Swiss-Prot record:
Keywords: Ribonucleoprotein, Ribosomal protein, RNA-binding, rRNA-binding. It comes from Photobacterium profundum (strain SS9). Belongs to the universal ribosomal protein uL18 family. This is one of the proteins that bind and probably mediate the attachment of the 5S RNA into the large ribosomal subunit, where it forms part of the central protuberance. Part of the 50S ribosomal subunit; part of the 5S rRNA/L5/L18/L25 subcomplex. Contacts the 5S and 23S rRNAs. The lineage of its organism: Bacteria, Pseudomonadati, Pseudomonadota, Gammaproteobacteria, Vibrionales. The gene is rplR. It comes from the Bacteria. Signal peptide: none annotated. InterPro entries: Ribosomal_uL18_bac-type (IPR004389), Ribosomal_uL18_bac/euk (IPR005484). GO terms for cellular component: cytosolic large ribosomal subunit. The keyword Ribosomal protein applies. One of its GO terms (biological process) is translation. GO terms for molecular function: 5S rRNA binding; structural constituent of ribosome. This is Large ribosomal subunit protein uL18.
Length: 117
């Protein structure tokens, strides 16, 4: 089993548990160049809020798009947008990525901005 298949297997297991709980989830995805975050409704078919380093507003406020500072900016933005829509409690879906580096930076920034998970 290769690295990507292992990550997807871990992500599927976590998503199944979150769906069982019926929680709104904060989903993250990272690539070497960008970080993406979405708040998804419990039914799994509606995106409530989204933020990423691809967006011009966020990209202009940071020097690089693929580092921890960029992830923190995305975390702050997604928290603000979710709270604006009335969502304050979420389940953190790390998509099988290790809770370290950019993933942890995004999560901590979202918590500091007011999201609870």
């Amino acid at each position: 089993m290769d690295k990507k298949a292992s990550r997807i297997r871990r992500a599927t297991r976590a998503r199944r548990k979150i769906a069982e709980l019926g929680a709104t989830r904060l989903v993250i995805h990272r690539t070497p160049r960008h970080v993406y975050a979405q708040v998804i409704a419990p039914n799994g078919s509606e995106v409530i809020a989204a933020a990423s380093t691809v967006e011009k507003v966020i990209r202009e406020s940071i020097a690089n798009t693929g580092n921890k500072d960029a992830a923190a900016a995305v975390g702050k933005a997604i928290a603000e947008r979710a709270i604006e829509k009335g969502i304050s409690n979420v389940a953190f879906d790390r998509s099988g990525f290790q809770y370290h580096g950019r993933v942890a930076a995004l999560a901590e920034a979202a918590r500091e901005a007011g999201l609870k998970f």
